[in-house]
Design a protein with these regions (language model features):
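Concave beta-strand-loop units of leucine-rich repeat
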Residues: 69-76, 97-101, 118-122, 139-143
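Single conserved hydrophobic/aromatic residue that forms the stacking wall/gate
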Residues: 154-164
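N-terminal capping/linker segments that flank leucine-rich repeat
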Residues: 16, 21-94, 111, 132
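Conserved hydrophobic position(s) of the canonical leucine-rich repeat
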Residues: 65, 92, 102, 113, ...
Length: 164
């Protein structure tokens, strides 16, 4: 009986010693789930970057993502409506998300972003916050009433600014 109790105790200790390793794996990455990426189509796209298919984007996997293209295509099951989770991709330099049904987009944490292409959405809010590296911005055919681009270091007038 004493041996059996000691055996159970050892098994419990060994099992508990494995728990911190499992917890740290999610602490050093982002789980690909409905909480972090609520939009199913965006979550599906994000899963393509999970090279080891463990359901978690590691810090290394995240830092290797420079470009995301998720343009709408109704023939492939609909449009993206929410890009919540885009803030995790801090090395992102190019985001293409045109022809969807996105109404709010916050890329203020994507400070490496140099190119943002999101025409033909339903954008009413676009937060460019700290995007001083942004060089190309396309937001035509949206519902934006105003757009603060004061964070940009250089802006050039569009051709329509010269129209008679």
């Amino acid at each position: 009986m004493k041996r059996r109790c000691m055996g159970i105790f050892l098994v419990l200790c060994m099992t508990l010693s494995l728990l911190p390793a499992t917890a740290s794996a999610t602490e050093n990455g982002v789980a690909i789930n409905e909480t972090n990426f609520p939009d199913a189509l965006f979550r599906e796209k994000v899963a393509e970057y999970d090279k080891n298919n463990d359901g978690v984007l590691s810090d290394t996997e995240i830092s290797n993502i420079r470009s995301i293209s998720i343009n709408g295509d109704s023939s492939k099951g609909g449009d993206v409506t929410d890009l919540k989770g885009i803030e995790y991709f801090t090395s992102l330099t190019r985001l293409q998300c045109g022809h969807n049904k996105i109404s709010k987009l916050d890329v203020s944490k994507n400070t490496a972003l140099t190119e943002l292409y999101c025409p033909n959405n339903e954008l009413t809010e676009l937060d460019l916050g700290n995007n001083t590296a942004l060089g190309q911005l396309t937001v035509t055919n949206n519902q934006l009433k105003e757009l603060d681009i004061s964070c940009l270091l250089y802006t050039s007038p569009s051709p329509r600014d010269y129209a008679a």
